């Protein structure tokens, strides 16, 4: 009778345990580390390449060495667009000096341009996919008689943000508008603009002989919000913003006067709905910075200490070193992640078989 009762109850025990085991396994499955395919972006006939930005089509932009010209020992760096395994030089930029730091889905790029042979007078510029240059202008000239400006980001609407003569700006439909910092802040800089028109950046103010920097968020109408700092930190910078209004950047502990500032420690942060939280770093490297985020809340950046540097991903409350998420023995040391798109692709820079190169990481299915 005893054996018979046991046989009759076994199916019930199994039926109860299976859903329990399945439920318990879900958090573990959800925390499985992502994996990536890594692609070397190559160069334009030279040796080195530096990626700066990425759009949702998988286009990467930056600067790459061309073949050596004449008797000079150095290569010439040219703006490039990489897509689908092919890198091409952006035409129309040979007559001047240019660099790009952001690209939107239409292939419009922003950065700075100078026709000065000595590269002394850079101006904020928008570059079309075919290389057409449009200067965005700047605020009143400096004491040197010209205006210095640089565009830092462009959104899907073609709006650009940046800095001119230490003042943040928004460029939209051919007009340049100042993004003023809060009262008490003397200078500002905009680093990122979302597709909704919000901008993130920083403002600087004097506190005695020191300068304090705070992350800023500018709403669509121009209203500015000081995001503050985390407890124990003195400064912060808003480096990226997404369409949900989340801001990523870093906080720091800074000492010294305005003439000589030393930052002792950095930590990446994510700000959302009035709350800033530190994202931490990896165990062997204490300092971290966040450079970009997408609308899914995935954040990328890097950790660094002295000569050690590693590209990072923050996702679902965890931090990952990207070097651990690519195939082993790939020959790569991924040092910095600078952009992430809606597909989860990541671009940045590192060392590949001893050569400095840009990379593209594509999530494995």
Predicted regions and their residues:
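N-terminal secretory signal peptides that target proteins for export/translocation
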Residues: 1-11
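Bacterial N-terminal signal peptides
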Residues: 14-27
């Amino acid at each position: 009778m005893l054996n018979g009762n046991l046989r009759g109850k076994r199916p019930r025990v199994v039926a109860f345990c299976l859903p329990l085991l399945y439920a318990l396994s879900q958090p573990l499955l959800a925390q499985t580390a992502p994996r990536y395919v890594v692609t070397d972006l190559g160069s334009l006939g030279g040796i080195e390449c530096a990626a700066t930005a990425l759009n949702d089509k998988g286009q990467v932009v930056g600067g790459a060495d061309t073949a050596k010209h004449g008797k000079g020992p150095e290569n010439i760096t040219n703006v490039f667009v990489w897509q689908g395994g092919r890198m091409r030089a952006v035409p129309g930029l040979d007559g001047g000096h240019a660099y790009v730091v952001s690209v939107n889905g239409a292939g419009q790029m922003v950065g700075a341009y100078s026709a000065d042979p000595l590269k002394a007078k850079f101006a904020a510029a928008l570059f079309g996919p075919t290389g057409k240059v449009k200067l965005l202008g700047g605020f009143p000239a400096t004491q040197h008689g010209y205006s210095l400006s640089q565009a830092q980001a462009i959104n899907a609407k073609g709006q650009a943000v940046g800095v001119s003569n230490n003042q943040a700006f928004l460029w939209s439909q051919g007009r340049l508008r100042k993004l003023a910092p809060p009262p008490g802040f003397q200078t500002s800089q905009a680093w990122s603009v979302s597709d909704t028109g919000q901008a993130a950046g920083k403002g600087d103010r004097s506190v005695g002989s020191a300068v304090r920097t705070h992350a800023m968020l500018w709403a669509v109408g121009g209203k500015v919000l000081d995001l503050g700092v985390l407890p124990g930190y003195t400064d912060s910078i808003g480096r990226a913003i997404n369409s949900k209004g989340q801001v990523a950047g870093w906080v720091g502990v800074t000492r010294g006067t305005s003439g000589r500032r030393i930052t002792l420690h950095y930590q990446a942060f994510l700000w959302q709905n009035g709350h800033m939280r530190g994202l931490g770093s990896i165990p062997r490297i204490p300092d971290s910075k966040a450079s970009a985020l997408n609308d899914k809340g995935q954040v990328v950046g890097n950790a660094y200490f002295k000569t050690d540097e590693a590209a990072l991903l923050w996702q679902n409350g965890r931090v990952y070193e990207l070097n651990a998420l690519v195939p082993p023995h790939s020959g790569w040391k991924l040092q910095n992640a600078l952009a992430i798109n809606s597909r989860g692709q990541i671009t940045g820079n590192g060392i590949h078989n001893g050569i400095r190169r840009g990379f593209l990481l594509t999530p494995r299915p």
